């Protein structure tokens, strides 16, 4: 059964915003209570958060579809809907977020670093929030916006200070098991290690992590063997340790040629040219291994490598190797800027962006694109004529009508607002020609202006009663 996964495809869907409420206040003896519809709640975000306790992407391999909760709709009596709950997804330190095309969206390094994979939709305004001096009792509310949906790829690049690289069965797993408390699978056949193993090493006052990367073979940079699956795990390491087998039984191999092959694969993979290298000649506890190590050590040192003769079985040379690595890591940490937890958002919301474009397409449709027009369309209930009129007013104030006229649009031409796959298309009627039908001051409560016969009769009765009482008081028979 799979227990380690370092690459998954994830579908993240944020919550939709709740719809606003169109409601009129109802209370005894208050016939004109006014609008009291509450706003809809915000949809929940989908957030990736780095957690040090998480070491694999296995959970998302089994369950790749994740959705945050929706915001609740508003209600009467000025009650706003509850916001949707954010969906927080823990990921390992070193997770890289990519889009489907392979472009890097975020590199999540450091405990607490967050990435907003999908933003929840805004809640719609209720009619109480839409009321104004001219629109005293709106008979509509705004719809909640849909949350963002995005397909992303998560790749784990192990965050370790040291990477052990080498041929299969060179003794990397044995070496990490004696340098640290790691318990990797160890056997005498190639590709025993199928996933990176991490261990923690303490050398004096320096504590660092070491990674045992699965064995590399010729063609690894092109994906041969376990190749590209695990080469990315060495990208973040401060130092590379070439583990060379001095007791190999294969006649066509020797430690120097193994080193040259691994270096060529690292060169082809790219990005590791300036990384410090150390050579660990392993298995020198075997007599033939010690003899071969003595032969090739001068050649390796002449190339500029620091060479250590080690044996995982006999525990030879381990202290010297661990302290040498600690020195290199301490220098690297001193020059590396401190990484702090950050919050990464793919596309921040444009708060004051009033920009939009109008283009004439080949099919004769005038297409309007812009953050505000598209958002307003998503918020409009097209089954409500008053809401549609409110949208027309907003677009006119933004300058969309003027831009359509300048672009050559005439009454009856088709206008589309939004992208091709999700646009609202309608026949345009300029406000100048349609104004006679739209001058009713939308949202106005005509009950405030029109005479009410019942109230008038009540006032007349009160006046007659007052007159009768006055006449009675003035009457004096004596």
Swiss-Prot record:
Q: Which GO terms describe its molecular function?
A: GTP binding; GTPase activity; magnesium ion binding
Q: Which residues bind Mg(2+)?
A: 173, 193
Residue ranges occupied by any OBG-type G domain in the UniProt entry: 160-330
Q: Does the keyword Protease apply?
A: no
**Which EC class does it fall in?**
hydrolase
- List the biased-composition ranges (Basic and acidic residues): 439-468
Q: Which SUPFAM superfamilies match?
A: Obg GTP-binding protein C-terminal domain, Obg GTP-binding protein N-terminal domain, P-loop containing nucleoside triphosphate hydrolases
Cofactors, names only: Mg(2+)
Q: Mainly localized where?
A: cytoplasm
Cell compartments where the protein resides: Cytoplasm
Quote the cellular component terms of the Gene Ontology held in the record.
Answer: cytoplasm
Look up the EC number in the record and give it: 3.6.5.-
**What Pfam families has UniProt attached to this entry?**
DUF1967, GTP1_OBG, MMR_HSR1
Q: Which family does it belong to?
A: Belongs to the TRAFAC class OBG-HflX-like GTPase superfamily. OBG GTPase family.
Q: How does it assemble?
A: Monomer.
Q: What is this protein called?
A: GTPase Obg
Q: Which organism is it from?
A: Streptomyces griseus
Q: Gene of origin?
A: obg
